[in-house]
């Protein structure tokens, strides 16, 4: 089909694919500026955050797609990165991947995703396997990197800090404060806690934050009201099992603060099966704000991690590292902030 025919087809379908020239003209900036934003080197040239956001928004609006094949042939680079996740299912990893994809595709990068399913041998083997595919960098999502690698590495929620790895982390103290102060205002004093799985990088950091904030605001943590998600099981099942254990202990509680939304949804299911009404008798708070949190019955009160933002920051940071020959990389973790989402799974404690 000729170019003229392609334009006509685009108008007919309503899909217009803009190139670098069209983007630059639309924004009133140079093609060089647009290119530097899209290939992740904006900060090297001190391009303002406002301009970066305008370029990314316009690229999405105008359906810009970088010609990755042509670029890679010219530069003799793979234009690919690797992404390691614990598992691919609804929730944390999927949301982070969405943010990573937003940035990489606009920048003309392709990515390989591998799921280690918490198997230590796969955690060790996957970095080498990905490097054998000529990836230029690696993003590890809730996955500990056990050795230094010869390529740039960005970690999302890996609290085992390594000098050569840039970490994207949530402010867990602020997250714990949001949840516990909310329950405290609702006069909850007997709070049950469902901790994360032993393999999760966030488990210890989040629990330490909870203990610190609880001590500050005068909430006493009863050890018999603390349980932990089992390392096996998928979806809501670990949360269901943890809540069954809490009920079997026979210790009264008026609220549950769960490690994640899937655990909280599992807890609500078990409470309902036991004839306990949420939130009239027991309030439940989750963590993450996954898609099903808002559609659950009742809609879940939760601490929202900006998961897609964390993915976008991770991908943007990795691209900057790939393009930065001087290795002038951040020396400290990049911290993102949570927000609190109050829905219908919490209410005042029954005195």
Tell me what each language-model feature is.
Residues 141, 156-158, 170, 194, ...:
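Generic beta-sheet signal
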Residues 1-77:
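N-terminal helix-turn-helix DNA-binding module of bacterial transcription factors
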Residues 1-15, 19, 76-181, 185, ...:
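Alpha-helical recognition/docking segments in bacterial nutrient-uptake
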Residues 242-351:
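Flexible loop/turn connectors
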Residues 28, 107-108, 187, 218, ...:
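Glycine-centered short loops/turns at secondary-structure junctions
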Residues 190, 221-225, 277-284:
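Short acidic capping loops at alpha-helix termini that bridge into adjacent secondary structure
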Residues 86-95, 114-122, 168-178, 194-244, ...:
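Hinge/beta->alpha junction and helix N-cap segments in small-molecule ligand-binding domains
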């Amino acid at each position: 089909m000729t170019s003229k025919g392609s334009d006509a087809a685009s108008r007919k379908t309503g899909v217009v694919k803009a190139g670098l020239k069209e983007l630059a003209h639309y924004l009133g900036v140079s093609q060089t500026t647009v290119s530097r934003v899209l290939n992740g080197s904006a900060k090297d040239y001190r391009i303002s955050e406002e301009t970066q956001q305008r370029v990314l928004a316009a690229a999405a609006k105008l359906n810009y797609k970088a010609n990755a094949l042509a670029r890679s042939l010219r530069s003799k680079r793979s234009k690919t990165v690797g992404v390691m996740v614990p598992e691919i299912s609804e929730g944390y990893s999927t949301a982070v991947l969405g943010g990573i994809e937003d940035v990489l595709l606009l920048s003309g990068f392709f990515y390989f995703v591998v799921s280690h399913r918490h198997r230590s041998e796969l955690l060790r083997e996957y970095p080498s396997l990905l490097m054998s595919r000529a990836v230029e960098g690696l993003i590890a999502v809730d996955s500990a990197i056990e050795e230094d690698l010869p390529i740039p590495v960005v970690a999302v929620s890996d609290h085992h800090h390594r000098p050569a790895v840039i970490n994207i982390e949530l402010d867990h103290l602020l997250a714990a404060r949001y949840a516990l102060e909310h329950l405290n205002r609702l006069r909850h004093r007997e709070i049950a806690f469902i901790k994360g799985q032993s393999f999760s990088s966030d488990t210890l950091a989040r629990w330490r934050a909870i203990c610190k904030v609880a001590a500050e605001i005068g909430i006493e943590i009863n050890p018999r009201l603390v349980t932990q998600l089992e390392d096996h099981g998928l979806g809501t099942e670990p949360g269901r099992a943890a809540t069954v254990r809490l009920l079997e202990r026979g210790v009264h509680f008026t609220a549950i603060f769960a490690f994640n939304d899937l655990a909280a949804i599992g807890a609500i299911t078990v409470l309902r099966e036991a004839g306990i009404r949420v939130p009239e008798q027991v309030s439940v708070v989750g963590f993450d704000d996954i898609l099903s949190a808002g559609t659950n019955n009742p809609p879940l009160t939760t601490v929202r991690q900006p998961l897609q933002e964390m993915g976008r920051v991770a991908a943007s940071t990795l691209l900057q590292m790939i393009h930065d020959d001087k290795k002038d990389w951040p020396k400290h973790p990049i911290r993102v902030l949570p927000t609190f989402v109050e829905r219908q799974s919490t209410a005042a404690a029954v005195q």
